[in-house]
């Protein structure tokens, strides 16, 4: 930007544009929810040792830890108008590979590699790793485009739409296996083979991912480098220099680290929910411990329904949080996380299938806050310089806690006598620590 260029500030966008910026997130969240809600079931069906599940659940956050900052940094320097612009080319690439892996992953048990064989589990782990890398590549552009294109007055609305579409995608994905079972699709299969209810769910999710992603790519027009610089009050060259991650982290606003502390405990809890909730529900409600049993598969389906309940609660609570005044962000954040802590911990005690609905409503309240407040608090404190890199680096506050939780599970799970319900009680304790950590946040805004 030269002396003759006037800082314009980001313009107000039509609501239809904001919806299109976020629309592809629906498909991405369907892919992620299918993965997180069915991964434990898939790998135990393939013959994975329950005490070693933590290794498989390290892969998603490990992918995000590397991929999202890299995509942020690379896209800050990218301008490819024929492929969509700055962020959208990475959405296209990620979507293509994610779809391939979604078609492959649930069929691994049908390749004749053998129940519990090293080949089957390694093949599955590689497929999960590629799916995670590609899904993370496709996900990050949506977060960055809001920072790039949406002004401060509309930003909370934009993130609210993203949260709503995210949770709507989770609802759709979570209901797929349950609905297909009702429609007569087989929910059990021979030993080592993933049931057709899960396989078809992944197929449908892949189709939706393609449609929603292409709608965003074709309908959204990113700002060219000159316009972006003028709107953000920076020079065109600013995003092409001084982008070393460690240097940027040293300059990160204090709230970046304060929110990251809260994220540590939030995602510790959520990692154990993804890893152990199906087994905990199977043990407490169905008294089932064999992953091949009908009871265990019913628990897997019910966990999918509960995940949908969580997402519906999150959609409703997100609307409530949008009405919370800016000076009460911390109150809304802390109370929401405390509700979630009760939800996690209650799974340890509850033996009733229907009573678990209340647990997941509380978890959904926490989930809404986890999707709303962190990005709002951090992006409000950032300038337009290296926006993608900073938001990618902030994603590490999601990934690192999950890696830590997975590694710690190799000690904690045996210590708790391999009790999956006890792991959910641990998640509840971590949720309480997350709520307490909110007290240390001091909200700031960019100049």
Feature roles, as predicted:
Residues 66-83, 316-329, 413:
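Helix-to-loop junctions at the C-terminal end of transmembrane segments
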Residues 5-63, 258, 262, 266-290:
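Helix-loop boundary and gating motifs at the non-cytosolic
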């Amino acid at each position: 930007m030269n002396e003759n260029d006037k800082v314009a500030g980001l313009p107000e966008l039509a609501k239809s544009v904001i919806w299109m910026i976020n629309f592809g997130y629906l498909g991405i969240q369907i892919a992620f929810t299918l993965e997180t809600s069915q991964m434990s079931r898939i790998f135990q069906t393939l013959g994975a040792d329950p005490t070693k599940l933590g290794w498989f659940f390290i892969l998603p956050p490990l992918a995000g830890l590397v991929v999202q900052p890299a995509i942020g940094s690379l896209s800050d320097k990218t301008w490819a108008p024929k492929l969509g612009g700055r962020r959208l080319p990475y959405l296209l690439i990620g979507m293509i590979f994610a779809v391939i892996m979604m078609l492959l992953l649930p069929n691994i048990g049908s390749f004749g590699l053998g129940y519990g064989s090293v080949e089957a589990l390694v093949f599955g782990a590689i497929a999960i790793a590629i799916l995670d890398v590609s899904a993370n590549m496709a996900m990050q552009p949506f977060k960055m485009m809001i920072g790039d294109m949406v002004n401060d007055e509309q930003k909370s609305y934009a993130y609210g739409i993203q949260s709503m579409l995210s949770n709507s995608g989770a609802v759709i994905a979570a209901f797929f296996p349950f609905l297909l079972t009702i429609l007569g699709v087989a929910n059990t299969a021979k030993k080592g083979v993933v049931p057709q209810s899960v396989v078809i769910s992944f197929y449908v999710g892949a189709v939706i991912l393609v449609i929603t992603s292409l709608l965003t790519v074709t309908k959204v027009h990113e700002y060219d480098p000159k316009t972006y610089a003028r709107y953000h009050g920076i020079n065109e060259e600013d995003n092409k220099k001084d982008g070393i991650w460690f240097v940027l982290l040293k300059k990160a606003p204090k709230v970046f680290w304060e929110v990251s502390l809260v994220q540590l405990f939030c995602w510790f809890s959520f990692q154990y929910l993804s890893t152990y909730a199906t087994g905990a529900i199977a043990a407490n409600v169905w008294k089932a411990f064999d992953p091949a049993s009908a009871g265990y598969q019913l628990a897997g389906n019910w966990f999918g329904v509960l995940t949908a309940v969580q997402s519906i609660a999150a959609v409703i609570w997100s609307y409530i949080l949008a009405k919370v005044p800016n000076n009460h962000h911390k109150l809304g954040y802390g109370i929401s996380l405390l509700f979630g802590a009760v939800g996690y911990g209650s799974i340890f005690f509850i033996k009733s299938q229907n009573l678990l609905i209340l647990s997941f409503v509380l978890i959904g309240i926490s989930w809404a806050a986890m999707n709303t407040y962190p990005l709002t608090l951090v992006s409000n404190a950032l300038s337009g310089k290296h926006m993608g890199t900073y938001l990618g680096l902030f994603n590490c506050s999601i990934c690192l806690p999950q890696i830590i939780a997975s590694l710690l599970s190799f000690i904690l799970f045996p210590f708790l006598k391999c009790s999956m319900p006890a792991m959910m009680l641990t998640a509840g304790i971590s949720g309480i620590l997350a709520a307490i950590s909110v007290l240390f946040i001091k909200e700031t805004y960019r100049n």
